[in-house]
Amino acid sequence: VQTCALPIFSDPCMQKLEESFNFLKTFSNDKIIYGINTGFGPMAQYRIEDESLSQLQYNIIRSHATGAGQPLPELYVKAAMIARLYTFLQGKSGVHKELALLITEFINRGIIPYVPEHGSVGASGDLVQLAHIALTLIGEGEVFYQGTKRDTASVLAENGLQPFQMHIREGLSVTNGTSVMTGIGIVNLIYARQLMQWAVGASVMMNEIAASYDDFMSEPLNGAKQHEGQQEIARMMRQWVKGSLCVRKRENELYNGKHEEKIFTHKVQPYYSLRCIPQILGPVYDELLNAEKVLINEINSACDNPIVDPDTQNVYHGGNFHGDYVSFEMDKLKIAVTKLTMLAERQINYLFHDRINGILPPFVNMGVLGLNYGLQASQFTATSTTAECQTLSNPMYVHSIPNNNDNQDIVSMGTNSALMAKTVIENAYQVMAILMMGIVQAIDCLDIADRISPRSQQVYKEIRAFFPVFREDTPKYKEIESMMVYLKKGRFQEK
């Protein structure tokens, strides 16, 4: 999404758009069709005279550009524009092909509409945020271009682009749909998948530090439960740990018949935050798969209203703009990521708590105890951030509030849910960054860098290149930020 350039569309794509537009142009001549010759929402009972039809399309854009709050980051706006474009390419909206081409130019040239975060109730889709996008397509409002917020008109002129001129229903088509929540959701999913990979890797490295027995990730144990996610997480852990000299084989020690101790010095079973990784992250994996399915379905759907269908020669009125699928999925996604974050926070606690791990100095402090403090204060950040994730995990899906003269008497709140999931994911990266800082410091405390698995060694070396071992106290906020950048790079290749 961040760097993509969309190709010029194929003839079949253009043909589908033209067929839809031409059919609607003829079909709508002598009929009452919502949003073409009627008002919008509860004002649909009012007929619009022919001489005002074009003005009607401009009015919905200008009247609904009422967002508030911080601007949505450019990456997420770009994703929303791609999602809206895909809706039009279904050929069910009756829009002129020039609209799709102009959106493509915006995306490819990095012209990103200013879109405030707040305003959508998720039905009729993301009206307010999409109106801000539509406002720029008609040459009004503001855009971000080459790092600067500017008036749209000057940016269009600079790029030799003309504002879009309304034909039949393009004002309604741009504003009416689930594209903002879907775009945010897709970016959320990409970051969440990357985060899950790190959670797996960090968990392997934690067990290397603890010198755990490795049977908790074995195929026979995890195959005894019929959950794809659990089995896949265990497989990923087995792949990561290959070549490690740190983890232990139960068969070589506890099963060799030579133990006569009354009290075992090494843990027979480690804490749940080390041992139950497949069972904890398995549902997260399964949820990511389901979220991917829902978002792919949504982006390849016509989430407009009404739906223009040249095949059946009809126009259908309904509610494809309703964002329930995305809303429900974003709620589930933030719950999954919060659980992942809670796991990371507990692993941090294991590393930092010398009376629990029994092998490391307090807070992986390699300096003078009492005089120096290691990563002690970073735990405050991880704990408070995890707590925020837990609160944000309460669902938006069931927080419908009637509005719009009760025309929208039950809504999805899908964009709110997607934005909350975005915050949860960002928080999770902060906690994961602190965990990875603790892990590499622990590896140096124990002097086991040459014994961990080759994959763990690669990560260790990459991190130590920008976060060297430390003994003296220095501010760590910049290192946390650098670690987050590293974690988001996308170095994993999923099967």
Which residues are covered by each model-predicted region?
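Generic structural signal for alpha-helix starts
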Residues: 49, 73, 96, 453-454
